[in-house]
UniProtKB/Swiss-Prot annotation:
Organism of derivation: Oryza sativa subsp. japonica (Rice)
Positions in the Lumenal compartment: 32-434
Protein name listed in UniProt: Probable glucuronosyltransferase Os02g0520750
UniProt keyword Transferase, yes or no: yes
Pfam families recorded: Exostosin_GT47 (PF03016)
Domain of life per record: Eukaryota
Role: Involved in the synthesis of glucuronoxylan hemicellulose in secondary cell walls.
GO cellular component: Golgi membrane
Glycan-bearing residues: N160, N421
């Protein structure tokens, strides 16, 4: 971790270092903004750097021809009808489950012959039951998922051949298929037992956590490409903000003391740096939020209730170096995106020294991170555009699935063999879903 190596820097020296970094970053703003313009609708130019080694090759892989996916035609109550009832689902950070379904329906990897399929996909929208405030209610999600699996296992023979081992589901909620927004409750619930053998495509990723199943594919949350395009600023705009963050520091409704929410990391950010002139941090979310990220050198990406957030996507797209404060986080497409090279990792316990850590990074290292971030392929991999584009997040998911092939013989059940307990889990999850 970067934070483990930096000592405390006097305030005057830190400020001077920040000024030098901001000045040095002015020339590289052109590359980052221009690359963002290409990704969301313009033409790129400027100073970029290709990802070296195998990661760069993986990022640019083409999954077409490497796998075939059969898309289950589930009743609309599991997907399309839910969106029709509440279209807000199309714009929230969990919308990857909707757009992945739409993408696969017209994708070249789709097969209409299930006997030819390498993978089976069940489109179940588990995060589209929203409150009046637009927040998802995951408490019915286990019943909904269970109902969908019961339906497809009765109508088609393919689930029963493997107990779901050649199936994948998109579960983009805070803690994935644990289906709860609070970590303690998510751990208590655990992953839905019926998904024990399936591959989970989820935004949540944390090492050695009960809500991250081995073999899962960690993806970025949804951030609307069209909205970001509408807020692009001139590519020669200087990066005059050293550190930027907008968001909650305390969740007073659920955690008034600030010790549990974000494991206290956000509270520590506020208490230590609310008056630091190098830090532009606030709970207010201005209309110029996207523009401000494009004017910033570092964008803070601390954990909240879960370790991930759309800030990570926004930072990469806008060329702002992500400062990742979430211990043991598993980042999206980590086999394709060199997060150590483009970001800065800070241990949660080192947040009080964040000013020293960031001002101690050599300018040459910062400029290289910016050149890597300016690579259009890097940005494209974080987005779910409509229509899909080469090397985008849809294609990175397919690449991840393709790399799991061929399935070992052990996934196919022998006569009489079963792995799943259909009555396991909390009693409330066994109630019928309507």
């Amino acid at each position: 971790m970067v934070g483990a190596r930096a000592g405390r820097v006097p305030a005057a020296a830190a400020a001077a270092a920040a000024v030098l970094i901001v000045a040095a970053c002015v020339f590289s703003s052109l590359a980052g903004a221009a690359a963002a313009a290409e990704v969301v609708g313009g033409a790129a130019q400027g100073n970029t750097e290709r990802i070296s080694g195998s990661a760069g090759d993986v990022l640019e892989d083409n999954p077409v021809g490497r796998l075939k996916v059969f898309v289950y035609d589930l009743p609309s109550k599991y997907n399309k009808r839910i969106v029709a009832k509440d279209p807000r689902c199309l714009n929230h950070m969990f919308a990857a489950e909707i757009f992945m379904h739409r993408f696969l329906l017209s994708s070249a990897v789709r097969t209409l012959n299930p006997e030819q399929a390498d993978w089976f996909y069940a489109p179940v929208y588990t995060t589209c039951d929203l409150t009046h405030a637009g927040l998802p209610l995951p408490f019915k999600s286990p019943r909904m998922m269970r109902s969908a699996i019961q339906f497809l296992s009765r109508k088609w023979p393919f689930w029963n051949r493997t107990d779901g081992a050649d199936h994948f589901f998109v579960v983009p909620h805070d803690f994935g298929a644990c289906f709860h927004y609070q970590e303690e409750k998510a751990i208590e619930r655990g992953i839905l037992p019926l998904l024990r053998r399936a591959t989970l495509v989820q935004t949540f990723g944390q090492k050695n956590h009960v809500c991250l199943k081995e073999g899962s594919i960690t993806i970025p949350p949804y951030a609307p490409p069209q909205k970001m395009q509408a807020h692009l600023i001139p590519p020669d705009t200087p990066r005059s903000i050293f550190v930027y963050f907008r968001g909650l520091f305390y969740d007073n409704g659920n955690d008034p003391e600030g010790g549990y929410y974000a494991r206290g990391a956000r509270a520590s950010l506020w208490e230590n740096f609310k008056n630091n002139p190098l830090f532009d941090i606030s709970t207010e979310h201005p209309a110029t939020y996207y523009e401000d990220m494009q004017r910033s050198v570092f964008c803070l990406c601390p954990l909240g209730w879960a370790p991930w957030s759309p800030r990570l996507v926004e930072a990469v797209v806008f060329g702002c170096i992500p400062v990742i404060i979430a211990d043991d986080i598993v980042l999206p497409f980590a086999d394709a995106i060199p997060w150590d090279e483009i970001g800065v990792f800070v241990d949660e316990e080192d947040v009080p020294r964040l000013d020293s850590i960031l001002t101690s990074i050599p300018i040459d290292d910062i400029l290289r991170k910016q050149r890597l971030l300016a690579n259009p392929s890097m940005k494209q991999a974080m987005l779910f555009p409509q229509p899909a584009q080469p090397r985008d997040a849809f294609h990175q998911i397919l690449n991840g699935l393709a790399r799991k092939l061929p399935h070992p013989d052990s996934v196919y059940l022998k006569p009489g063999e079963k792995h799943l307990n259909w009555t396991a889990g909390p009693v409330a999850d066994l109630k019928p879903w309507k």
